[in-house]
Amino acid sequence: MAITKEELLDYIGGLSVLELSELVKAFEEKFGVSAAPTVVAGAGAGVAAAAVEEKTEFDVILLDGGEKKINVIKVVRELTGLGLKEAKDAVEKTPTTIKEGANKDDAAAMKAKLEEAGAKVEIK
């Protein structure tokens, strides 16, 4: 008569910690396997590789509209396509995110244009 999986699980569930330890050792010897976790080392290497990866998306944040707000409003409208009122609100209610997820070159170009108009800008 064969033992079902359910019966086997019930039996193993009733074992003490010492008996379970002996069972694991017996499995290791009989089948030539190890119960030591191997995934832990691999996970650490993956995290290190992700940390080295270069950032590809940047946010352009307007910190201050400066003294020449009209010029900054014009540039904000040009870069974002916002209407006059929305662009004015963005310049007056700083800090404001002007662009999210821009690539490195676009973010740098936007920053240069806004700074040329008199704004203080940050790229994150």
Swiss-Prot record:
GO terms for molecular function: mRNA binding; structural constituent of ribosome. GO terms for biological process: translation. SUPFAM superfamilies: ClpS-like, Ribosomal protein L7/12, oligomerisation (N-terminal) domain. Belongs to the bacterial ribosomal protein bL12 family. PANTHER family: 39S RIBOSOMAL PROTEIN L12, LARGE RIBOSOMAL SUBUNIT PROTEIN BL12M. Signal peptide: none annotated. NCBIfam families: L12. It comes from the Bacteria. This is Large ribosomal subunit protein bL12. The keyword Ribosomal protein applies. InterPro entries: Ribosomal_bL12, Ribosomal_bL12_C, Ribosomal_bL12_C/ClpS-like, Ribosomal_bL12_oligo, Ribosomal_bL12_oligo_N_sf. Forms part of the ribosomal stalk which helps the ribosome interact with GTP-bound translation factors. Is thus essential for accurate translation. It comes from Wolinella succinogenes (strain ATCC 29543 / DSM 1740 / CCUG 13145 / JCM 31913 / LMG 7466 / NCTC 11488 / FDC 602W) (Vibrio succinogenes).
